[in-house]
């Protein structure tokens, strides 16, 4: 019965012409129900009415921009080319920055059951190129999709798991510009170095400062030399007053990753500008039934 209810709800969303007052972003595509950062997940997100696709990018050995949350094959989602599991102890050795993209494509990142997302469909998928994701989204949406792209950099990863920040940013910007989507793209990062380089190289592009659960929003903002358009904190760092204060200073507030219905309702009540969720269907349904 629950499965039937889910199917009916999904079909209703697919045919729904709701117009949410906030930016509903599909986290890693549609991770709650489809493999993360996959073409199929991004397409399903667009199918139900998501306007902004949120994703992460890393760099391969041959300087391809790859859509992946980690710069290695995460043991939670990846199977090796022989269909074998990868242990947590060995996952870091499957370093994407040391692998060509042809090698990366041989790994299945969707068939393994995801323990934290039991409703996620098991589909054989590979990590796509950013260019592939953009090509699909532009075709499906006729050039109306927005992109929120996280550049996955950390100081300790430089030259080991990722290129130096300047090179990393250049590769991402080159692709965004060549695809003509810069006006519909936000570049986000937890790494303030990366945002500084983005701002220097392409001051017109929108940026978002990510703040994790162990950081203080104000302290993180003080580490930047400029004012980003968006502050994107872990959702539990927010309350109504914090949101109001940030917005009064000219920032948009788009928290992550809001998945439970009660949390979604609470965050919406704060009058945020957007919500990043693994379950964009739940967020969109909240608007369609009101």
Where do the protein language model's features map onto the residues?
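Phosphate-group recognition and catalysis centered on beta-loop-alpha active-site segments
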Residues: 16-290
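Bacterial Sec-dependent N-terminal signal peptides
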Residues: 1-23
């Amino acid at each position: 019965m629950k499965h039937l209810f889910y199917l009916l709800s999904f079909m209703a969303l697919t045919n729904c012409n709701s117009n949410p007052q906030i930016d509903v972003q599909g986290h890693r595509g549609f991770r709650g129900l489809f493999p993360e950062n996959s073409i199929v997940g991004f397409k399903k997100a667009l199918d139900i009415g998501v306007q902004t696709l949120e994703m992460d990018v890393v760099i391969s050995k041959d300087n391809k921009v790859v859509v992946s949350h980690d710069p290695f094959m995460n043991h939670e989602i990846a199977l090796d080319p022989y269909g074998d599991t990868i242990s947590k102890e060995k996952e870091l050795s499957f370093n994407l920055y040391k692998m060509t993209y042809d090698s990366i494509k041989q790994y299945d990142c969707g068939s393994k059951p995801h323990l934290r997302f039991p409703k996620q469909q098991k589909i054989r998928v590979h990590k796509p190129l950013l260019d592939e994701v953009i090509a699909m989204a532009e075709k499906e949406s006729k050039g109306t999709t927005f992109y929120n792209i996280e550049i996955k950099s950390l100081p300790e990863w430089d030259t080991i798991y990722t290129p130096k920040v300047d090179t990393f940013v250049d590769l991402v910007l080159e692709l965004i510009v060549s695809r003509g989507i810069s006006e519909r793209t936000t570049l986000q990062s937890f790494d303030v170095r990366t945002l500084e380089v983005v701002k220097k190289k392409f001051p017109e592009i929108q940026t978002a400062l990510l703040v994790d659960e162990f950081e203080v929003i104000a302290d993180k903002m003080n580490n930047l030399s400029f004012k980003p358009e968006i502050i994107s904190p872990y959702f539990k760092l927010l309350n109504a007053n914090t949101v109001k204060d940030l917005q009064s200073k000219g920032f948009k507030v788009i928290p992550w990753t809001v998945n439970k219905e009660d949390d979604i309702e609470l965050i919406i009540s704060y009058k945020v500008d957007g919500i990043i969720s693994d379950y964009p269907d739940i967020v969109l349904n909240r608007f369609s039934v009101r």
